[in-house]
């Protein structure tokens, strides 16, 4: 073999070895980026479903941020120790998210403060994302890294934009303006929202269902019933425009009692509850029997029903955080109000449900006080019809009506079906009037 050929072959082998040696740290760098980001995601999920499951929105959000901070910190540390292209810039998002997360968990701000912070964190997060992109581009060690990092940057940017839009929409949407005649009444440390229309006695009090606010009952039912008597739609604590209070040990019956007294709403009352609201109606009737002249249960839950949310209830606490970045708006009806508020209401009701079902179970009979049970005829879960039949036995004066083509929600949301709910309420009002002479 000629010397030139041997020299050429040696040069080729040397280049191949050099290329392979160069690709090894590049592959290692890509693995570190991917594994660090994945570790951050896994840590966030573990914190949310583990030690902080079922926590308040501020705690859940803080746990997620701490998990993400772990991922960015790993990227900064491992890239410095194990690669020739250290990603020291990752220490900045790690520190920012760790500080924000720890602050949320320690201070545990309420919904009002989190809403106010909605004007602050989206632009800060967007600025951080831009800064991260600029510095990450300078430290790229392979063509693989951009495909690993840029989707993460994109998700963070979308969260910032979504959070900003959600805050702006909640503050400016004319459809969410306060309805004339709505009052905020102090019931002892917090205020409840109530709006009464119509005239006459007995007064009808509308109890919204699971995750619902007074607006749901006031859309079709309240105006119809107002033609017959006085009707009041109110928001329980933490719902609609009412102030939030800790869910643990919350006494809804006491709140309503004080609200009606301080708002100068005269009794006796016909309490009409939809879904979970039916359980609040029964609890109130048990606690203040002399004030309740009649009850209407609109496809109500049953005190002894299986709690379908018992298993995932603690995991549902992540919903308000997702709503805060605009995800709930994608799946919600714009007419129903603020998705962020709805999400918090839903989680609060789910957490309160076991205690509320137990309180409702204390009422074993309404005696001869008129009762109307309205049942949706479609899309009901197994055993629902039997539970509705059992509710109808609570009074010796009962009307049980099934709306064949109605669903659980259409009894209050569909105009035609809501009219039948309104009719059932008005019928009980007339029955009470006949009894009182």
Over which residues does each language-model region extend?
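Conserved hydrolase catalytic core segment
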Residues: 266-306
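Internal/C-terminal transmembrane anchor helices
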Residues: 142-169
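Flexible "cap/lid" loop of the alpha/beta hydrolase fold
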Residues: 296-325
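Active-site loop/oxyanion-hole signature of alpha/beta-hydrolase fold enzymes
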Residues: 236-270
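Conserved HGGG/HGGXW glycine-rich cap/lid loop of the alpha/beta-hydrolase fold
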Residues: 197-241
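Conserved serine/cysteine hydrolase catalytic core
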Residues: 334-403, 425
């Amino acid at each position: 073999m000629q010397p030139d050929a041997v020299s050429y072959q040696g040069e080729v082998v040397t280049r191949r070895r050099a290329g392979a040696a160069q690709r090894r740290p590049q592959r290692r760098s890509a693995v570190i980026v991917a594994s660090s980001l994945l570790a951050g995601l896994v840590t966030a999920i573990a914190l949310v479903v583990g030690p902080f499951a079922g926590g308040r929105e501020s705690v859940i959000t803080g746990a997620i941020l701490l998990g993400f901070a772990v991922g960015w910190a790993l990227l900064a540390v491992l890239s410095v120790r194990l690669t020739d292209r250290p990603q020291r810039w990752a220490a900045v998002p790690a520190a920012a998210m760790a500080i924000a997360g720890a602050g949320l968990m320690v201070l545990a701000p309420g919904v009002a403060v989190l809403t106010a912070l909605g004007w602050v964190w989206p632009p800060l997060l967007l600025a951080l994302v831009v800064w991260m992109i600029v510095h990450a581009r300078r430290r790229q060690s392979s063509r693989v890294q951009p495909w690993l990092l840029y989707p993460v940057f994109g998700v963070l940017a979308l969260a910032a934009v979504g959070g900003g839009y959600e805050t702006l929409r909640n503050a400016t949407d004319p459809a969410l303006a306060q309805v004339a005649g709505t009052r905020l009444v102090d019931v002892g440390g917090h205020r409840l929202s109530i709006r009464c229309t119509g005239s006459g006695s007995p007064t009808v009090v509308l109890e919204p269902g699971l995750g619902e606010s007074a607006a749901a009952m006031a859309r079709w039912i309240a105006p119809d019933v107002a033609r017959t008597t006085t009707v009041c739609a109110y928001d329980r604590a933490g719902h609609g425009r009412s102030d939030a209070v800790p869910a643990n040990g919350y006494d809804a019956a006491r709140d309503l009692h004080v609200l009606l007294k301080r708002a100068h709403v005269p009794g006796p009352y016909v309490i009409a509850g939809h879904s979970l609201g039916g359980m609040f109606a029964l609890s109130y009737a048990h606690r203040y029997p002399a004030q309740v002249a009649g009850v209407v249960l609109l496809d109500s839950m049953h005190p002894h029903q299986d709690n379908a949310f018992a298993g995932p209830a603690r995991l549902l606490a992540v919903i308000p955080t997702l709503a805060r970045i605009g995800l709930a708006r994608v799946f919600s009806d714009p007419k129903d109000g603020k998705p962020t508020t709805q999400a918090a209401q839903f989680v609060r009701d789910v957490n309160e449900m076991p205690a509320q079902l137990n309180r409702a179970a204390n009422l074993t009979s309404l005696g001869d006080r008129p009762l109307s049970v309205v049942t949706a005829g479609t899309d009901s879960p197994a055993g629902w019809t039997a539970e509705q039949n059992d509710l109808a036995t609570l009074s010796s004066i009962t009307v049980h009506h099934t709306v064949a083509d109605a669903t659980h929600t259409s009894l209050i949301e569909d105009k035609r079906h809501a009219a039948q709910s309104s009719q059932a309420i008005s019928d009980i009002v007339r029955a009470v009037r006949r009894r009182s002479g």
